[in-house]
Amino acid sequence: LHSISMDVQPGEFVGVIGPNGSGKSTILKLLGGVLSAGPGNLLFKGVDYLNQNRKHLARSITWVPQEHSMAFPFKVSEIVLMGRHPYLSAFTFEGEEDIEIAHSAMERTQTLQFAQRGFNEISGGEKQRVVIAGAIAQEPEVMILDEPTSALDIKYQIQILNILKQLNEDRNMTVVLAMHDLHLASKFCRRLVLLNEGEVFQDGAPEEVLQKDHIEKVYDIRIQLVRNQDGSIMISPDTLCIQ
């Protein structure tokens, strides 16, 4: 990344898009506190990430990575309950309220049916839903997700995006996520940040960012673009005219 400057306001639903290697995962890891900003500054509510208590910051911001692996044989229910750890004192266990919150998060993500199975025994798509359930149980102000629909079939892609939309609308939760599917990005996100070679190429409403010339330049491919009545787009690459 270079020459990046952006801000996210409370309650926004922001999609970060761009081709492979454009910097999507890097910028989300910065926002999630996984990477250091290096010579730059990264602020939450005007305070540098480095100057904030990590446990308190975890109550406000949750990070959902693209890939998940566990060295220990945790059950699905235990993974979701980990979302409550920022609220627990040292050497204390989850209480009834924590268990209820985790149960509700599993219901919302349809993961309750395999709550007692081992996390490493379930499919990649199921793991993604479990990790998102844990993020919901964390009850953050901001949720940062790196391609949360990448391992899901279309049914669960729509389900997860609808869940995030509901959290955004009902709780005013700020959502920032990387996406590859430009159709879904245009349908669910209210703001899109289009990256190209580590820089912000376009930033604005989906109908402003997802212009034919912008997509062709950044993705280096000629396309046919159809804009639906709801503002979402359908893209048909002309494979015979790849630039």
Give the predicted meaning of each segment.
Residues M143-E147:
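Catalytic Walker B motif of ABC-type/P-loop ATPase nucleotide-binding domains
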Residues G32:
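Helix-to-loop junction immediately C-terminal to a conserved catalytic motif
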Residues L81, E96-F114:
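Conserved ABC ATPase "signature" region
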